[in-house]
Swiss-Prot record:
Organism: Bacillus licheniformis (strain ATCC 14580 / DSM 13 / JCM 2505 / CCUG 7422 / NBRC 12200 / NCIMB 9375 / NCTC 10341 / NRRL NRS-1264 / Gibson 46)
GO BP annotation list: chemotaxis
Keyword S-adenosyl-L-methionine: no
UniProtKB keywords: Chemotaxis, Hydrolase
EC number: 3.5.1.44
Chain's role: Deamidates glutamine residues to glutamate on methyl-accepting chemotaxis receptors (MCPs). CheD-mediated MCP deamidation is required for productive communication of the conformational signals of the chemoreceptors to the CheA kinase.
Organism domain of life: Bacteria
SUBUNIT field: Forms a complex with CheC.
Catalytic activity: L-glutaminyl-[protein] + H2O = L-glutamyl-[protein] + NH4(+)
Name recorded for this polypeptide: Chemoreceptor glutamine deamidase CheD
Family to which this protein belongs: Belongs to the CheD family.
Matching InterPro entries: CheD-like_sf, Chemorcpt_Glu_NH3ase_CheD, Cytotoxic_necrot_fac-like_cat
Amino acid sequence: MKILEKETSIIRVGIADVKIVRTPDKIRTSGLGSCVGLVLYDLEAKTAGLVHVMLPDSSLSKTPDINVAKYADTAVEATVKMLLEAGCRKYALKAKMAGGAEMFKFKMTNDLMKVGPRNVLAIKKHLSLLNIPIVSEDTGGNSGRTIEFDPQSAELVIRTVKQGVTTI
């Protein structure tokens, strides 16, 4: 009798989107400029969530029905909730992230235009409030990124425009 192994799928996460995967599947997002790709995972459960965060703060939203994946202040908690519902343990969650670039340099000193760095700071703040450690990150700079996470190995592969591939 032959045992069938599940074929690996790569689940794609869009902009302002969040998805959860289990091994053997992997999860990927692209188009990370000032946006941040945040991966939360439980290595023992072989489960991970990836959220593609666009903006730091939902208070600027003009609609009452916000997309929680779009904003750092709502995306972190929403992803944690989804992972707990999928069987992960909060104390075992760890984080990796990439993105948060300054894609366009402005001559202004107004921090409001620095969306990438503000996204990174907002995510770090909310992870800290939930006591979730950041294991590694590749943030800042001025180049776009595509990331792919494997919940089996906890490796985050980062493809940076004109800079090649790194794994964290």
